[in-house]
């Protein structure tokens, strides 16, 4: 078996426009395609994170609330590799995104921090 890389990650959001603004205008991901699917009454937005990875955003009518504990089963957080945590935190702060204090990962010895998307999904920056 050769699982060489992650192609995409899919998340369900409660507010399509807020999520689109956050991921496109604040984080800078580019839109690959955007579709409203009337048979499902939902939006599907495909975003390019980098040359290898995509993020799929689904917005359904009245989705169940996310369990907002990192220790709950399912996706714990989504981590992005950056060259400089400090620089990226400054850029996020400039567009109104609040980050936790920067700390060093006890095991990897790398700088890291967390922030959240509009639905509270934890997002990590990691050097």
Residues covered by each model-derived region:
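Vicinal oxygen chelate
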Residues: 2, 35, 46, 89-127
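Exposed loop/turn and edge beta-strand positions of beta-sandwich/beta-sheet ligand-binding modules
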Residues: 41, 74, 109
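N-terminal beta-strand motif that seeds the catalytic metal site of vicinal oxygen chelate
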Residues: 1-18, 75-80
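Core segments of cupin and vicinal oxygen chelate
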Residues: 12-53, 94
């Amino acid at each position: 078996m050769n699982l060489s890389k992650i192609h995409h990650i899919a998340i369900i959001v409660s507010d399509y426009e807020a999520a689109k603004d956050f991921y496109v205008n604040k984080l800078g991901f580019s839109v690959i395609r955007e579709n409203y699917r009337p048979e499902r009454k939902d939006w599907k937005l495909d975003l390019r994170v980098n040359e290898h990875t995509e993020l799929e955003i689904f917005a359904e009518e009245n989705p169940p609330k996310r369990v907002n504990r990192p220790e709950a089963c399912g996706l714990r957080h989504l981590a992005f590799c950056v060259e400089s945590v400090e620089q990226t935190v400054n850029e996020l702060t400039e567009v109104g995104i609040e980050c936790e204090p920067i700390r060093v990962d006890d095991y990897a010895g790398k700088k890291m921090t967390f922030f959240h998307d509009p639905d509270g999904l934890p997002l990590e920056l990691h050097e």
